[in-house]
Amino acid sequence: AKVKETTGIVGLXVVPNAREVLINLYRKTLEEIKAVP
């Protein structure tokens, strides 16, 4: 599901804060990876 969300955000390249959204997604992904033992 998260992969689809990422694809949707990338599809909206017109969004001004797209970079901010991608950074937040990147942080979430890193946190989830850290949570994995």
UniProtKB/Swiss-Prot annotation:
Key words of the record: Electron transport, Membrane, Mitochondrion, Mitochondrion inner membrane, Respiratory chain, Transport
NADP in keyword set: no
Primary location class: mitochondrion
Subcellular locations according to the entry: Mitochondrion inner membrane
One family name in Pfam for this protein: ETC_C1_NDUFA5
One annotated Gene Ontology cellular component of this protein: mitochondrial inner membrane
GO biological process, one term: respiratory electron transport chain
Membrane topology per record: Peripheral membrane protein
Self-association and partners: Complex I is composed of about 45 different subunits.
Protein purpose: Accessory subunit of the mitochondrial membrane respiratory chain NADH dehydrogenase (Complex I), that is believed not to be involved in catalysis. Complex I functions in the transfer of electrons from NADH to the respiratory chain. The immediate electron acceptor for the enzyme is believed to be ubiquinone.
Family affiliation: Belongs to the complex I NDUFA5 subunit family.
Protein name: NADH dehydrogenase [ubiquinone] 1 alpha subcomplex subunit 5
Organism classification: Eukaryota, Viridiplantae, Streptophyta, Embryophyta, Tracheophyta
